[in-house]
Structures are given as C-alpha cells and as structure tokens.
C-alpha cells in the first residue's frame, strides 16, 4: 500500500520545486502540494485504509478521529467513514460567530482521539491541535501524517508527549522519483 501511495503522490504532481515559504515559516526549495492528492477519492480511500490498518497493527485504539483545518479535514473525514468513528475538526481559530467553538463535533473528557495531518515539517500545527484536544479532556493516542518532511516534526511532537506515525517520508518520495531534495 505504501508503494501505491508514493506512486499516487508522485503521479499527482504533488512535489513542486522552486522557492516556497512553508506554514512553519521555513523557506524551502520544494513544496509538497498535497491538496491535489487529498481531493482525489482514490487517494483518500487508500490513505484512510492505510491509517486504519497501521493503527490496528500498532494496537492503537481510538473512539474518534480528528484533523486540523484545512488540509487534514478530507483525510479525517475519509478515516471517519472508513472506521465508523465520529469526526472532530479543530479550527485554526475560535469562531467569532454562532457557537464560537474551537472544535467541531462532540468531544468528551476521556475520549481517545486519533489525530491526522496532511504534511508535517516542524509539527507546529498538529501539536497545537493535539494540545487543544488535550485541553478538552481527550487523550491523543497517536498522530498519523501522510507525508513527513523529516525536518523535526517527529522530535518536536515526541517532546510534547505525542507519537507521530508517518505513512510516507519525504525521502521515500525523492528516492522513488529519482531526484534529490537539495
């Protein structure tokens, strides 16, 4: 399944070269434009199936699936449908209108939540989401990411007491594509 995902990422043209500013604020000579992948039903089904299988193999039990907006929402939705587990969406900022929620979906103290993300660089966005879930009494039992750029996310996430499970490492992508990230 991993090889199939790597091929889909490459064939979807998700690896872009040039000058980019990442969400983390870091500058990079490449960008993983995962949005074209996570709007593809075939890719979403594969990603959801992989996360379901990997979490089962690792013995990770969870009650709910969560993802920070925007990139992780399609992934979390696909996983929610694949597993029949309720979905939580973590907003970037609290709504200024309506209910003013930071988390969409029903969350209760003691919920075991599997958090998903599209791409990690330093892990800042997903750490923020994990802390919000924790503040609401949930236990984040694992964080799955489609692509880890291998730029400190794993270490930063583990420093905060969470565990990162990448489906694909950026080095896997460059190796399969036969290119150097430098």
From Swiss-Prot:
Enzyme Commission identifier(s): 2.4.2.10
Lineage of source species: Archaea, Methanobacteriati, Methanobacteriota, Thermococci, Thermococcales
Described function: Catalyzes the transfer of a ribosyl phosphate group from 5-phosphoribose 1-diphosphate to orotate, leading to the formation of orotidine monophosphate (OMP).
Cofactor(s) listed in the protein's UniProt record: Mg(2+)
Species, as recorded: Pyrococcus abyssi (strain GE5 / Orsay)
Binding partners and assembly: Homodimer.
Keywords: Glycosyltransferase, Magnesium, Pyrimidine biosynthesis, Transferase
Classification via Pfam families: Pribosyltran (PF00156)
Binding-site positions, orotate: 121, 149
CDD domains to which the protein is assigned, alphabetical: PRTases_typeI
Domain of life (superkingdom): Archaea
Sequence similarity: Belongs to the purine/pyrimidine phosphoribosyltransferase family. PyrE subfamily.
Binding residues annotated for 5-phospho-alpha-D-ribose 1-diphosphate, in chain numbering: 91-92, 95, 97, 117-125
Pathway(s) per entry: Pyrimidine metabolism; UMP biosynthesis via de novo pathway; UMP from orotate: step 1/2
GO biological process: 'de novo' UMP biosynthetic process; pyrimidine nucleobase biosynthetic process
UniProt key word Lipid biosynthesis: no
Catalytic reaction(s) noted: orotidine 5'-phosphate + diphosphate = orotate + 5-phospho-alpha-D-ribose 1-diphosphate
Protein name in UniProt: Orotate phosphoribosyltransferase
Gene Ontology MF: a single term: orotate phosphoribosyltransferase activity
